[in-house]
Amino acid sequence: LNCWGKMRAWGCHMVHHALYQKQNYSYAGVIEALSGAPFDVRFISFDDLRADAHVLDGVDVLINVGDGDTAHTGGGEWEDPAVAAAVRGFVYNGGGIVGVGEPSGHQYEGHYLQLAGVLGVEKETGFTLGYDKYNWDEHPGHFILEDCTKPVDFGEGKKGIYALPDTEILVQREKEVQMAVHAFGKGRAVYISGLPYSFENSRVLYRSILWSAHDEESLHKWF
């Protein structure tokens, strides 16, 4: 889910013939991993969401990847109640969502991550410094991390991400959340701060998608 949809399918994190960029590689790895994963992938724009109330029918998991206030994650598109309601409703009714970087990032109505309540994490931008933040315990035994043989490589990662009270943190470093999971209604959300391409990270994304879709039992179908 981004501002381009099909217009930049498979190229939405590519810069100048996919040359390495420090600002980009932590997100490009998601596209790289998806390209070899056993999933059907559709590229959906925010205009698609507005134009067709059924555009998410048949979708199991949404993925929103990139820095806040960019076309990658949507920026001001999240001010549209129809967009926010469509995505929240999709997850609440049983869909999955994987957010990487600053998904739905846009300062508006007291939140930076507009899907904070869905993802279970928020970014500290100075407005919530006085909020108590007691949730820092890690849960490394989660399904998503079972293939990892070493600490997860988040690339550049993200600064200032904290978990809401009912969120399960998988990885935090120096009290900055790098990976977390959260239930929202009947649905599931996964937050990852960055995902440069590697074999292990491709497994992390694979497992994140299966878990968020309530489909862990399919893990060994294409092992």
Model-derived features with residue positions:
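Alpha-helical scaffolding within the catalytic cores
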Residues: D47-A53, A82-A85, E174-Q178
